[in-house]
Every structure is written in C-alpha cells, then in structure tokens.
Amino acid sequence: MKTLRWGIVGTGGIANSMAGMIEMADASEIAAVSSRRMETAQRYAKKHGVPNAFDSWQEMIDSDVVDAIYVATPTSVREEICIAAARGGKHVLGEKPFASLPSVQRITAACRDNGVAFMDGTHFVHHPRTLDIKQHRADRLGFVWSVASAFQFNLGDRGNIRFNPELEPMGAIGDAGWYNMRAAVE
C-alpha cells in the first residue's frame, strides 16, 4: 500500500492535534507543513518530525512532496486553499466549519473535476458508531421530530480567532455549533 503524504496548512491547536492522528493512521505520514511565517512552520515541523516547511500554502501545494492537504485555517480563507489544492491534484481534508453551502459546493466541484477526494473535518460523521446510531434510529425510533443538543468548550482568551469576524465570520457558534447542527442532520 502506498503511503499517503500529507501537507498541513496551518499550525494552530487543531493542526497539532491532527498531527498525531495522521501519524497513527496506517499508510499516512506528514510530509510538509505551511504557515504564514516560516519560523512557525519550522517550529511545527521540528515538534512533529515533519521534513518540509513552507511559508506559502501555494508553494506546498505546487510541490511534489504531498499527495493530500489538511486545511486547518480560519474559515475566511479555507475555500481558496481547498480549491487550489484540488486543482493541484491533491486530496483535500478541510476543517470545519465551511462558510456556506455554495462554498462547499464549489470545493466539492473542484475536487470532483480534478479527480481527488474531499472530506470535511467533522470527525464523528466518519466514525463507524455514527452508522450504528443511524441504524438504531431507523430500527427503533423512526422519524425524529425534535433534537435538543449542547456543546461547550473553553474558548480561551479574546485573541482566539473565533472572536475575529474577519477570520471566522460565524464565530464560536460556527465552530462549536457545527457539531450540534451536523448531528441533527445526520
């Protein structure tokens, strides 16, 4: 089996968490990382044993060192990077949330048109237990008329990107609320 060489765009908290997940996966390795600042990319690369660091996501996509891109950036720039990766022949794993339905449709069209895979980063929908829950609902509950849901986490300081509407147009509700909304429609 060929090893899938990942490039990670972004070096924040979720990108650090994802590094361990990629390394634990069979036939996967992190081959490159990009950040707006080279020193940040190099620090991430050193921490996670990544051989290539870039200060431009476009240069990383254009390189031949990666087969797939994990996009862990603010929502405001995610679509552009996902589409560029697809056009560059790279498979795309885009972190959630996405800006809008039309945005996701453009990303999936770019992936389809370029023969690459697309997945969103809502981890639980790709987990086998989600299929079990759906089957249980179908077998025992039938149509669900109402859903009550809660999700919380510590946002940390006010420097968190979720407080910046230019970077995260939907703010914390787009990030945390995404889980609740996705669970309801799944």
Regions picked out by a protein language model, each given a short descriptive name:
Residues 68, 74-75, 79-123:
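Beta-strand-loop-alpha-helix segment that lines the small-molecule cofactor/substrate pocket
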Residues 1-48:
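N-terminal Rossmann-like dinucleotide-binding module
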Residues 32, 52, 68, 146:
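Short, Asp-centered acidic motifs that coordinate Mg2+ and/or phosphate
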Residues 2-4, 116, 142-145:
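Nucleotide donor/acceptor-binding cores
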